[in-house]
Amino acid sequence: MTNLSRLPAALLVAAAFSLAACGDGDDGASEGRAETAATRDADLAAIKGYLLEHTARLVDDTAEIRAGAEDYFGLAKAARFDYARLLQEHREEVRGLVEDAQAAFAKANPSYEEMEGVVAGVPSLAEYDVIIDAGGDASEPDSAVPFDIETPAGRTFKQPGNFNFLIETTAYGTEPRFQAKGTQPDLDGDGEAEFGESLPDADFYLAAARDFEKYAKELDAAAREWEPTAGDALTALVVMTPTMSEYFAAWKNSRFIAGDQASEKAFVAASRLQDIADILGGLVLVYDNVQPLVAKADSQQARQTEQSLEQLHGLAAGLLARENAGHKFTAEEADTLGSQAQERAEAIAGQITQAAAKLNIEIEAG
């Protein structure tokens, strides 16, 4: 039996959605009437508008990534994919393209993270979170992405991981599988390969960039088709708010805390704290637009939940500001902060779950 507690949030939502479909018909009719009434009290159009703004941004950002990959592939092809020759003849051009790739990813990342709370928390959209940001590779069957990468040269990368991981680690050179083989990525010509110097496998990078753009467009289309319900919004809050411990663990294991000893290959373009703040910022927007509905269950509790969620967002933003100002957090501090954030997040999710029960609105989470 699948252990749902070990799955990414998006997979958990999708599994719960399937189980919910088997529920009692009379209960479903009652919940449907509650949903209809609830829709009048929540500004669901504002939530969808926020989502569409971000899916459109991601489409544009992935097009920029793909265009850069096309340019890099063309340069590598002209050198017959001889990467030593490529560096010898076009070192500055390669360096510029790699730096552009890193900048393009850094731009695309918040376009997704700011909407992740909605995408990962809504059953009809949750698979795209697995594809873009949460899914693992083939070594993790329960959470692996549902796609393979087919390259122009005819190679197949079976379930290689989510696209944020693929693009970031290729652009920054932190995943050797996606790098050119046999040539040191010495982009500045100083005789050493340092962190941030990358020589992507052009064949793989182009295929990954093209597919990233394809799935970004699919997400945009699915978001346009989505008809939001109050249950969707409350589910997103309940599922995505109490994910702090895993995010803080990724931060602890990243270069921002562990330095060269980092076990995380991703989260190098920006601190995981940035992602946490972006995700929580999106969830604050979702809650703001359903608070009038939650207040019908308990107005005082609704205000307390609002305050608690804003404080949790403020905690993440404050930690990020300290880190950006030069403070070096320790692994022990990351553990403590993660536990504190998770405790707060679980309390918030519990309050929203209670409100949904009083309103007879189903939360589609296991």
Residue ranges and their predicted role:
Residues 1-20:
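Sec-dependent bacterial lipoprotein signal peptides
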Residues 20-21, 311:
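A general secondary-structure boundary signal
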Residues 22-27:
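Bacterial signal peptide processing site
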Residues 32-366:
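Mature extracytoplasmic or organellar-lumen-exposed domains after removal of signal/transit peptides
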